[in-house]
């Protein structure tokens, strides 16, 4: 009887090992068919070589004087560093990007004990991508909007000092992804 239990126990262990092996093999076969995608890889037609990113104007009701130049510079830097495109400053560029900051508003986003605890700064940008290399190509409109929460104990200028780098980085990333990614 003791021998029978050992044989039975051994066959159960063998069965478990076989099942685990088959499961691992199945998962590996599924993963082998997957491609690795790079989220920072831009999708640009080969004939496009130059881009003109115009100054992004601030047409929002409230005007943060630092935002327009910093966002424009960050977007230009991102495009030059993560694509093969060359930034030019003339109307002969293959791609022409123009636009403006359309919204820069603060609203209440959190209330605690009947007092404002958190404010939200919402920044929106509207851009147009013009493809001069492809005759008859329609301009592509792009909208990017991000919200940033900050403590209600801060004034707007104090919050802007804390949030400025994050605002510029996040908006530039979103604009870049909408301009060049096929996601």
In which residue ranges do the predicted regions lie?
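Sec-dependent bacterial lipoprotein signal peptides
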Residues: 2-34
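Compositionally biased, intrinsically disordered linkers/stalks adjacent to structured regions
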Residues: 160-183
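Surface-exposed short loop/turn segments
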Residues: 39, 81-83, 88-141, 146-158
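Extracytoplasmic/periplasmic, Sec-exported soluble proteins
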Residues: 63-71, 113, 117-121, 156-168
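Structural motif marking the loop-to-transmembrane transition
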Residues: 14-18, 60, 160
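Structured catalytic/translocation cores of nucleotide/phosphate-coupled proteins
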Residues: 74-75, 96-100, 171, 182-183
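A structural "domain/chain start" motif
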Residues: 32-76, 80-84, 133, 177-183
């Amino acid at each position: 009887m003791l021998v029978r239990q050992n044989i039975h126990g051994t066959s159960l262990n063998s069965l478990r090992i076989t099942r685990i092996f088959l499961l691992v093999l199945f998962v590996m076969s599924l993963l082998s068919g997957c491609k690795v995608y790079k989220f920072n890889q831009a999708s640009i037609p080969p004939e496009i070589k130059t881009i003109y990113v115009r100054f992004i104007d601030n047409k929002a009701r409230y005007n943060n004087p630092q935002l327009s130049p910093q966002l424009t510079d960050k977007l230009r830097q991102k495009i030059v560093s993560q694509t093969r495109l060359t930034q030019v400053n003339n109307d002969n560029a293959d791609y022409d990007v123009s636009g403006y900051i359309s919204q820069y508003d603060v609203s209440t986003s959190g209330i605690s004990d009947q007092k404002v605890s958190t404010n939200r700064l919402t920044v929106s940008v509207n851009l147009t991508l013009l493809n001069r290399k492809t005759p008859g190509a329609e301009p592509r409109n792009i909208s990017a909007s991000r919200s940033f929460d900050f403590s209600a104990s801060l004034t707007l200028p104090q919050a802007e000092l804390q949030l400025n780098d994050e605002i510029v980085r996040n908006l530039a990333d979103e604009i870049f992804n909408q301009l060049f990614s096929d996601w």
